[in-house]
């Protein structure tokens, strides 16, 4: 659907569920303290869609942040379970400013990573390159000012849409690794909990980069099931910085 319609839908849904997810979001989750991986490798120049090697790592990546309470629930989930993950942030969403006090300690500790997903989530291939540059640069400035990092070299183009010109503009700002994904929880549109858990069961495999979103509340009701799934498969959650350095 068009970007403006998508954002309007997400905000409307998020506004109606603030009270519903004010309860402890990680109820039922198994608390696991992940060991930080040893021995990082250089990040690839170009497209990254899967972690290298044959280990047991799982890179959870969380996009957008259209909902203030859902971003807050993710922060609480990370604190409660020790899960390591990477946020791909749209700085235009107020959730990243509202929840900065909760997230900044997790970022400073390295448990949570921030990366660049553009300022406002447009289709970059429909814009002039000067506008693409502004989208990336404005978001980088926001990340530095709010979280002390610009997330380079990891950049995720909205909708996964990019081309050589977009990649060059991103690389000129230090974002040399276009980060896509190899599996998805399937929560970009409204789904029930059973569907999200079923999608996760397919996606949560060794060395996968998994896409999820901090937009709709249903994902916050699945935290316990998702954490149990990770533990049952002996997977180790990692940020991208845990793997590449």
Range-by-range predicted roles:
Residues 1-60, 67-74, 80, 100-104, ...:
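N-terminal pre-catalytic segment of deacetylase/amide-hydrolase enzymes
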Residues 33-116, 120-123, 131, 135, ...:
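Active-site beta->alpha N-cap acidic-glycine motif
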Residues 62-64, 89-91, 116-118, 157-159, ...:
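A cross-domain feature marking catalytic cores of carbohydrate-active enzymes
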Residues 65-69, 90-99, 122-127, 156-162, ...:
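Acidic-and-aromatic substrate-binding clefts and catalytic sites of carbohydrate-active enzymes
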Residues 73, 77-81, 102-109, 142-146, ...:
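Alpha-helical structural signal in soluble globular domains
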Residues 79-86, 113, 129-163, 197-212, ...:
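CE4/NodB-like, metal-dependent polysaccharide N-deacetylase domain
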Residues 161-203, 235-245:
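His/Asp/Glu-enriched short active-site or ligand-binding loop at hydrolase and phosphoryl-transfer sites
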Residues 194-195, 209, 213-214, 220-222, ...:
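Extended hydrophobic blocks
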């Amino acid at each position: 659907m068009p970007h403006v319609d998508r954002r309007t839908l997400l905000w409307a849904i998020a506004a109606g569920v603030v009270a519903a997810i004010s309860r402890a979001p990680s109820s039922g989750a198994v608390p696991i303290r992940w060991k930080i991986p040893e021995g990082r490798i250089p990040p690839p120049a170009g497209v990254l869609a899967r972690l290298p090697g044959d280990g047991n790592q799982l890179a959870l990546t969380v996009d957008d942040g259209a909902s203030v309470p859902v971003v807050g629930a993710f922060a609480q989930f990370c604190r409660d379970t020790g899960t390591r993950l990477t946020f791909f942030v749209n700085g235009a969403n107020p959730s990243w400013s509202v929840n900065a006090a909760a997230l900044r300690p997790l970022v400073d500790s390295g448990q949570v990573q921030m990366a660049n997903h553009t300022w406002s989530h447009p289709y970059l291939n429909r814009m002039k390159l000067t506008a693409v540059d502004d989208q990336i640069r404005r978001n980088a400035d926001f990340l530095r000012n709010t979280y002390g990092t610009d997330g380079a070299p990891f950049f995720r183009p909205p909708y996964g849409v990019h081309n050589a010109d977009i990649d060059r503009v991103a690389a000129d700002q230090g974002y040399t690794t276009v980060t896509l994904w190899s599996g998805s929880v399937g929560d970009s549109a409204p789904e029930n909990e059973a569907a999200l858990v079923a999608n996760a069961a397919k996606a949560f495999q060794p060395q996968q980069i998994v896409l999820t979103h901090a937009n709709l509340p249903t994902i916050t009701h699945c935290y316990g099931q998702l954490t149990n799934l990770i533990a049952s498969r002996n997977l180790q959650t990692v940020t991208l910085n845990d793997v590449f350095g």
